[in-house]
Design a protein with these regions (language model features):
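Core of folded catalytic or high-affinity ligand/protein-binding domains
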Residues: 1-126
């Protein structure tokens, strides 16, 4: 978490970024946090049991029920998707409704390694 916070500060303090680029890169970071730490799941693969990772899920009984129904394929509204950092950072979210997707990671190490080896995705400088 500390590295995510530091990256956010670095984006804000980067003098090469216009305000629009700062917003754009922070939005990518926000999407990353949203789909992993807020609304993520953890499982070795799609055929194993899932555990709730995200605090946004844990804080809502409706969200918990939605995840359970999605895992059991009893719900056509939300899908379970294997984590991919590019997919995650470019996917917007709606905080006012149940989530239409939940990404799952294999492990915290996998998530951290993915984040730390793809920092450039959060440092877009424009065309």
């Amino acid at each position: 978490l500390r590295d995510i916070g530091r990256l956010g500060c670095n984006i804000l303090e980067n003098m090469e970024f216009t305000d629009n680029l700062k917003f754009h890169n922070l939005k990518r970071l926000q999407n990353f946090v949203w789909w992993t730490l807020e609304f993520g799941l953890i499982a070795e693969n799609i055929n194993t049991s899932f555990e709730i990772l995200g605090s946004g899920i844990l804080s809502s009984i409706d969200e918990i029920n939605n995840v359970i129904k999605s895992i059991k394929y009893e719900n056509k509204y939300s899908t379970i998707i294997k984590y991919d950092i590019e997919n995650v950072v470019f996917t917007c979210f709606d905080y006012s409704n149940l989530q239409d997707r939940y990404y799952y990671i294999e492990s915290f190490d996998y998530l951290y390694n993915s984040f730390s080896s793809n920092i450039d995705i959060f440092l877009f400088k424009g065309d």
